[in-house]
Curated annotation (Swiss-Prot):
Short motif HEXXH, span: 276-280
Lineage per the UniProt record: Bacteria, Thermotogati, Deinococcota, Deinococci, Thermales
Record's protein name: Thermostable carboxypeptidase 1
Short sequence motif named I/NRXXA/SD, residue ranges: 357-362
Organism: Thermus thermophilus (strain ATCC 27634 / DSM 579 / HB8)
PROSITE patterns in alphabetical order: PEPTIDASE_M32, ZINC_PROTEASE
Positions occupied by motif GXXQDXHW: 412-419
């Protein structure tokens, strides 16, 4: 068999696998939005069956045979060619999948599905005791998976693993290691705590009560759809639905869905949650469609993905220019804003206050929420903490980092679905996304000029086009660190993000 024939076989086989995985994505969307209460048990079995089938395909020995034919051939001589990128990523995925026993893959998929379903019901009733056995099982299976992956060599060119947690982190942010993360977080923590102290000591406080007036859900939904359309989200290739825990999910190139969570007496959750998930969806809608089903057409990492969502939620969506454009319309849609000025509204949506809930945190304190989770995850996978001890450790770290502590489980250790879904190693990518976002935005302004005046005129396409050309179009061609360096000329750093916050909040809290 020629290298060309082997590569064609790989393309066809991997695309077929991607079609099956996209059915799993559709089932996952349904499970978190529309499924009847009595359908969860059957759905867990469906997901387990699909996981078994996908694992069998991902470990098919023919993949190894085809890869061997292609590797070292002229097809992959240029390491940045489409074929070379695909072969590089397929090889790593194949080795990782082959190392994980089918029994473990199936058990983990079923345990995660069951834990997520139970979490949906248990969180509102604050049932930590009932949820704990589900979490313990997911944690034990995830740790077993991490031990298997830790024994593998990292991808060519990536640094070696230093600890068990690295093997999980690598699955979400390829090439990132805990030893690189921790100095970034240390620099960030110092800068954030200094800024937070100055803000809290300024004596200035916005009137956030204006955000807790009546905001009818249907009006929020209509307004959210208007924002989506104006910013460039293709509503003919996606949809917006309500859910308990907002997310974006890509079913395929013409089907990228987002969800949000509405409260009748809180403006921010529904509107800024929509903008956040829209940022994720704009990335997915901007990936090269001709490469769908291959790594060349995939998002490079969760950190880069998060950079897009945080950009649209915060750097765009919480800017004064954005609301100069949309606040007049908001006053038409929401009678509650009739007596509110643009300046007071903008100050309110940028209020800074230590809080308990990560997804509702402000830009200054958000990454301290992530630091809590990172430290707890590291402790879990270093054997320094067990799942039973999480509530107490959680409260202690919240007191230390944010000066607040939860009075219950639902607003404490049970507030996120991530651990139920086995997503250990995922949380740090949120902070990496904030750092990348600030670096990308800084570079965009250097090339396009000031962006807020454009936003005030409703001109979002030039910035979206810039991100499409420099970030989205590259797919997984480059490692995240390399992509950031190529786009901005600098390695990932906390400095641009801290500079952005200092400038913005000095103007607000002066």
């Amino acid at each position: 068999m020629t290298p060309e024939a082997a590569y064609q076989n790989l393309l066809e086989f991997q695309r077929e696998t991607a079609y099956l995985a996209s059915l799993g994505a559709l089932a996952a969307w349904d499970q978190r939005t529309m499924i009847p209460k009595k359908g969860h048990e059957h759905r867990a079995r469906q997901m387990a069956a699909l996981a078994r089938l996908l694992h069998q395909r991902m470990t098919d020995p023919r993949i190894g045979e085809w890869l061997e034919k292609v590797e070292g051939s002229p097809l992959v001589q240029d390491p940045l060619s489409d074929a070379a990128v695909n072969v590089r990523e397929w090889r790593q995925a194949y080795e990782r999948a082959r190392a994980i026993p089918e029994r473990l893959a199936v058990e983990l998929a079923q345990a995660e599905s069951e834990a997520e379903s139970f979490w949906e019901e248990a969180r509102p009733r604050d049932d930590w005791r009932g949820f704990l056995p589900y979490l313990k099982r997911v944690y034990a299976l995830t740790k077993e998976k991490a031990e298997v992956l830790f024994a593998l060599p990292p991808a060519p060119g990536d640094p070696p693993y230093g600890e068990l947690y690295d093997a999980l982190l690598d699955g979400y942010e390829p090439g990132m290691r805990a030893r690189e993360l921790l100095p970034l977080f240390a620099e960030l923590k110092e800068g954030l705590k200094g800024l937070l102290d100055r803000i809290l000591g300024s004596g200035k406080r916005p009137d956030t009560s204006i955000l807790h007036r009546p905001y009818p859900v249907e009006a929020q939904r209509r307004f959210a759809l208007e924002l989506l359309s104006a910013c460039g989200y293709d509503l003919e290739a996606g949809r917006l639905d309500p859910t308990a825990h907002p997310f974006e999910i890509a079913i395929g190139p013409g089907d990228v869905r987002i969800t949000t969570r509405y409260y009748e007496d809180f403006f921010n959750a529904g509107i800024f949650g929509t903008l956040h998930e829209m940022g994720h969806a704009l990335y997915e809608q901007g990936l090269p469609k001709e490469h769908w089903g291959t790594p060349r057409g995939d998002a490079v990492s969760l950190g880069v993905h998060e950079s897009q969502s945080r950009t649209w939620e915060n750097l765009v969506g919480r800017s004064l220019g954005f609301w100069e454009r949309f606040f007049p319309r908001a006053r038409e849609v929401f009678a509650s804003l009739g007596d509110v000025s643009l300046e007071d509204f903008h100050f309110a949506v940028n209020a800074v206050e230590p809080s308990l809930i990560r997804v509702e945190a402000d830009e200054v304190t958000y990454n301290l929420h992530i630091l809590v989770r990172l430290e707890l995850e590291l402790a879990l996978f270093r054997g320094e903490l067990s799942p039973e001890d999480l509530p107490e450790a959680w409260a202690e770290k919240y007191r230390d980092h944010l000066g607040v502590a939860p009075k219950d489980y639902k607003d404490g250790v049970m507030q996120d679905v991530h651990w139920a879904g086995g997503l250990f190693g995922y949380f740090p990518t949120y902070t990496l996304g904030n750092l990348y976002a600030a670096q990308f935005f800084q570079k965009a302004e250097a090339e396009l000029g000031p962006l807020e005046p454009r936003f005030a005129r409703g001109e979002f396409q030039p910035f979206l086009d810039w991100t499409r050309a420099r970030i989205h179009a590259e797919g997984s061609r480059f490692r995240p660190r390399v992509l950031v360096e190529r786009v901005t000329g600098e390695a990932p750093s906390a400095r641009p993000f801290l500079a952005y916050l200092e400038k913005k909040y000095a103007a607000l809290y002066g």
